[in-house]
Swiss-Prot record:
GO CC aspect terms: cytoplasm
Superkingdom of origin: Bacteria
InterPro entries, per database record: MetalPrtase_cat_dom_sf_prd, YbeY
One annotated GO biological process: rRNA processing
Name of the protein this chain belongs to: Endoribonuclease YbeY
Gene3D superfamilies (UniProt xref): Metalloproteases ('zincins'), catalytic domain
Binding site for Zn(2+): 117, 121, 127
Gene expressing this chain: ybeY
Organism: Mycoplasma genitalium (strain ATCC 33530 / DSM 19775 / NCTC 10195 / G37) (Mycoplasmoides genitalium)
Amino acid sequence: MKSSFSINSSRLFKRFFGKNYQAGVELCFQIIKSSLNLSFDPEFALLIVSCSKMKKLNKQFLKRRGCTDVISLCYNETETGFSLAIGEIFLCPKYIFKKAKEIGCNNWFLLTRCLIHGILHLFEFNHEESEAFESVTMFFQDAIHEEILSVWKF
């Protein structure tokens, strides 16, 4: 069974993954699901936002200033009852692509990494809690990213 997700901006993902962009996002998610040994198929929303929208989200939910690459909002059980809906991921491609240029890497390489990072946050991998959590989160993020890059060439 496939996970259920919705994407608000298919044009960007068509450029990234080609005509079958949903298969690309599904591939990312299935590799993460396999890596985490999940036995269920959660639902999530993937939203592409502008820098101005991301600034507002960053201030509203994280109490931080400025734009950022990815924000994940987890639904907690009291909000949704028993549900497979786990949350929403907001990506800001303009910020991600600017950052990619600054560090000298491929736009799509960094976008994939941010997508993985966002999905891991939905599973409560929180690198900001402690150094140990950061090590575990980055280990999973690197391993999953490497596996995706070995399967999906861009």
